[in-house]
Every structure is written in structure tokens, then in C-alpha cells.
Amino acid sequence: MEEKAGLGRLQNQQDEPAQDPHQRAGPRATFHSDRNHPNKEAEAMEGQNPACSRHASSHSIQPQASKPKKHRNYLDGAAVDDLKSLWDRLQTLQQSLTNMPYAEGLKPLKNFASFEELLSMGGDSLLNDLLDIQDSITQCCMKVSKYLNKDGSCASLNYYKQPFIAAVYGPTGCGKSQLLRNLMSAQLIVPAPETVFFITPQVDMIPPQEIAAWETQICEGNFLAGPENTVVPQSGSIMPKFVQMSYAELTNEANYDVTNPTNVFARAASKGPLAIVMDECMEDLGGNRGIAKFFHAFPSKLLDRFPKCTGYSVIVVLHNMNPRRDQGGNIANLKIQAKMHIISPKVHPSQLNRFINIYTKGQPTAISLLLKDIFNYHRLNTNFDWIVYNTEPIDNCMHWLYLSPDEGLIPMYLNIQAKVYQAMERIHRTITDRQRWTRYYHSKKK
């Protein structure tokens, strides 16, 4: 009977110690199979006898891994700090949405009166959802930090993405020419161009003062401060070239063929990176002569043929975001191929609103209205600030950026603002559900 009862036990259990404390215990049983066990009817450890059905042992060799709880029932100090950080962001966004003039048609969201009320009345489900949102915000901030400078500004506009096609929108007097030079001198376009082609309808349209400013600032952008009061060039050229061209010279058929020895762009690309800046050419762009190949086909051929040409940039200045005249389709192709849309807040609000409605379809309505309010604020209170939309950002936090002469290029973190607004909606839904069930309870009680 004892032998049958011991079939379900483990064979490596230690023998009971002897009564004498100085006496050693008997030998431990070893792991074995049926062939070398003194009792041939004993069962093996690995369950090699499937025909014999028995109940599983209550003591398993390896304990099962404990499953994590779906919700935590208590909040530690770190969790409270995370909730407080999210609560501060939430309060700031809620106040901004309430005070902005575009909030008339926006549905007001219910919220707790204080952070203490949120902790005491929120409930485990709500608090854990808010902690998940805060964790995703923290991960977004950590992910984008490696692309930023120590002061939080962006190190570049394109981060070596090629080709770099940008459209600049702004009325007369908003500082477009100064912006173009600042992009070169501030080294926001990498790699720094060794040759800059400045395209205007006529060559004599550029005053000597502006030519001197261009030559000075592109030279400034080619150097960085080095050790012991030295400067380090950022390209293979000590002095970058500034080349003036008319729009007619740009559209010369020879300049489209990269194999043509007279192609000015091919000769420049054989030495290093280049940039093409088109200013005051909006009327010519709207004509019949198509130059869309400069935005897509020509860059790939140039970059493949000349290894030294590690950068190809085209920056086109437009006075109107939606021009009526575009016979050659140049402006339409430019908007499609452009990776950057640099917009002055001085642009007419109707054009701005149309652009925002198109490029913020994936965002909540409140975030789109917030972006319109930001444009409106800078239109009324600043002069030379710009807002940038990046179609292919290196990080989602950089879809929308703010460019200031004082602060540099700063991400606007609209994706994080959307997450904060998601937390506001979650709190609103919880409070609304509780109020609905309270009304239902009182109606049944009567």
C-alpha cells in the first residue's frame, strides 16, 4: 500500500533524519528511469508513461510565473508624481482651450475640481488609464530628446534627409529674404551647401547690400567654433560660392541634362552640396514653362551621378498659399514634393485655416483650433516668427515647429497635446457616466 501511495511523489525527497543527531541521514534518492530503479514499477519524472493517468502533484518543480495585475490597487510616490505632472499639463491645456477665441463651438469637458479630488474620487480604472497616458508622453519626450540641443531646440530642419525641398509662404515685408539667409547661417540645413544659386526673375533685381549679406551669412554658416579660438569648416570649401541666376537661365534645357558639360548645377554638384533658392519668381512659376523636374526627377539623377554632392536643397518663396494662376502645374507639384512648409503668421487667415484643416485631419478638433489660435497670436504680437510643417519628420513631435530669431527652431509637440486632450476626454467620460448612473438610480428609487 505504501508503495502504491508513493507513486505520485517526487523521487528526490530527502530521507527522514535518524533519531541520533550525530548519525548521518540515509542516501538521497536519485533521478532515474525505470531501467535502473530498484522498483521497476516506479514512474519516471518526465511523464514517459502516458497510458497511466494520475493527478498532478500539488508541488510542481518550477512554480508558475505570477501574472501581472491588470490594475494596481494602490499608488506609490512615483505614480502620484506622474499623475501630478499630467494634471499640470491638463490644467494648462484646458485653460488655453477655454480662453482662446476659437473655442465657441468646442464642447466643454468636465473635470475634477482639484488634484486631490482626482486621487480620491477617480477610481483605479481611471487613474491607471491616466498613468498609461503619462507613460506614453514620457516615452515620446525621451525619444525626441536625442534629436534636440541642450536648450530644447532642434539641431536641424532636415537631419540629413535628401533631397530637401521647402516652400516659404509669406506676404511682402514679413522677412522672407532674411529667413532664407538665416537658414544658411544658422546651419539648419545639413549638410551646408558649398554653392548657393539665387534665382530671381532678373539678375539686376538684387541690390549690392543684399548680395553682401548673402555672401557673409553663407560663409558664416560654413564654420563652427573650434578649440583655442579656431574655426572649423563644415564642408570641403573654405568660401562657399554665391551664384546669381535669372529664371530664364534656370529653365535652360542644358541645365536639365546632368550629362551636359555646360550644366551649371552638375558642375557645382561635382564639387559638393548645393542649394537653389528661388525668390520673387511666383509669376514665372505660374506660367506655362514647367520646372517640376527640379523638385523630384533632377535631384535623384544629380545625387546618383556625383558622390560628392551629399546635399541638394530647393527653397521656393511664394507670396500666396493658393495662387490662382498655375498653368504649368509648378506650384501644385511643389506643394506635393515639399518636405517643409515654412509659413508666416502674417498670411491671410482664410488661407492658413484651409492649410491647417488639410494637414491636421488626424488630430482632435480641439488641437486644430489650438493651432489656429497660435497662428493668430503670432500674427498679432510678433513680426519675424515662423511656423513650420514637416511632412516627413524624424520624430512625430516635430510635425509642427516654431521658428524664432531668439529661441531657434522649437518643436510644438502637438502629438503630446493630443494625448493630454485624450486624458481630458477620459476624465469627462468617467464623470459623465457617474452622473448618468446617479440619475438612473434616483429615478428607480422613486
From Swiss-Prot:
Chain sites annotated for binding ATP: 170-177
A GO cellular component entry from the record: virion component
InterPro entries (alphabetical): Adeno_IVa2, P-loop_NTPase
Main localization category: virion
GO molecular function: ATP binding; DNA binding
Family statement: Belongs to the adenoviridae packaging protein 1 family.
Binding partners and assembly: Homodimer. Part of a genome packaging complex composed of packaging proteins 1, 2 and 3; this complex specifically binds to the packaging sequence on the left end of viral genomic DNA and performs packaging of the viral genome. Interacts with protein 33K.
HAMAP family: ADV_PKG1
Name the UniProt record assigns to this protein: Packaging protein 1
Organism: Canine adenovirus serotype 2 (strain Toronto A 26-61) (CAdV-2)
Gene designation per UniProt: IVa2
